Amino acid sequence: FISAGQKQMNQLDSTASAEGNTEGLDFVDAESRVDLLENKVVLCVPEGSDKGIDSFDSLAEHLKAEDILFCMGNSDVPVGQYTQKILAYYDLDEAALAAAGVITYGSNVKEVTTQISEASVDAGVVYCTDAYSAGLTPVDEATKEMCGQVIYPAAVMKNALHAEAAKEFLAYLRTDKAATVFESVGFTAL
């Protein structure tokens, strides 16, 4: 299992804190758990946009002015959670912006990239890798201070039908050969 966030892995890992694993689930082979990749949270705008959004700072100004339509992931998906941290960093009230009709949501990062690509919104926050896949050019990259790091943990599940093969595959994903592929699409191998 590879997750785009520690929270989702922690929910399945009995060795995670009680705060992280609120239901006491025990699906992760803790000895196999590794931090595999890092992704970046980026700001993208539609090609040819004339709104002047070229940084997270300018995005925050436009959101405060309520003069754009911004897309972010729902709060139950990792990219949405990282975006919420960015909004908090700029002291922006997500609920108030949503009520004002300034925010639209995607149920996953693909929906956010689609809204940006189709110019249905003026800006959106996605992962660097998803921007790459969708042919979008990021205009800014969130700092660690804005939203923390986007670390992709990986682990073999205790109920894996082919646990040894899963462990071998996870070991392969940590090789230089795999790192080259990951880095070619925007990830940083850890």
Predicted regions mapped to residue ranges:
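Exported/periplasmic ABC-transporter solute-binding proteins
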Residues: 3-21, 25, 32-39, 45-190
